[in-house]
């Protein structure tokens, strides 16, 4: 058994009786500002067929009125203290999660912390979801769907069905279907909200030039009234099966100006419970080295004027859209008329790495670059503006075991909408 990963003692972590988890950290860069996040550990993959698009729709509705901030109150309140809608105030829905952020909040404004925490609170459990507002938002979603209906999006949706046969990951893109968006009953959205927006699936992250003790006390007070539904539904993490024969998925679109070839070699994903010890860090380092060395090989090949591809990459990570399956992922952008040759080159390089590994000099170059980037990150850790997002990703989304954190302790998303 490897020892646990050392945790940052400056991150205050707690869990309320209702199941909500919070992460709070002081960081004085930028000075006088703070970031507030709420993570919902649910996304479009949990939608039933007649709910496709509701996770994303609900995200939009969070800016259309809450109990304490009716109408346009959320936006008006935050803009009054210097937070800009879109730039500082935003949200996203992905297949597995939904995240809301309030960034660059000036701490010099009286009541700013309270306002932001109450907005997070109302997003978590006090949306109004008025019928008239829902109907207005249907048109907004339609326009977003129209703008996102690109050749790449259409092809991705087409191949996903083949890559995930009989699996929700094959058709649960956050934007949903316009048939559902146009016709779902008002109560369907309210039922979805009450079923899934609940404390055990939520996390609060506050990072910035703050007093940690004061913010923690406010979180405990403000969020304590959130309640769990009776007989809460299980949050299922849908597995992805292996396939006995290679899956070949082809898609074409008249608007797509160049081709892309992907190769995936699936393997088991790292279980969440195994992500809290040093073995996971060692594996993460090995993956980083693999990606850098493969990247160097592919870049060198692409520089040859006779190369059949313009660019290529190989790494190890998630299998396309699914967090529940890992894969060695490779892609190339072939030159015109050279798709088969480019595919063969990619496959050859993946096999060469598998069978023969890498040279010592390749490893030393990759390691030197990696250590240099680590040193830079360490030296700039106090100035890292995205610290709140890092905490969110590592702890809230990778489900680091809470009981391993201790009472004092303690980051594309794919297919975003």
Regions found by a protein language model. Give the residues of each.
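Extended non-catalytic domains of envelope/secretory-pathway proteins
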Residues: 213, 282-283, 287, 328-333, ...
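Structured mid-domain segments that build the active-site/substrate or prosthetic-cofactor binding neighborhood
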Residues: 261, 268, 280-360
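Mature N-terminal segment immediately following signal peptide/propeptide cleavage
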Residues: 2-37
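An aromatic/glycine/proline-enriched structural segment found at the starts
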Residues: 203-259, 368, 372-378
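Beta-sheet entry/capping signal
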Residues: 21-22, 201-203, 260, 327-329
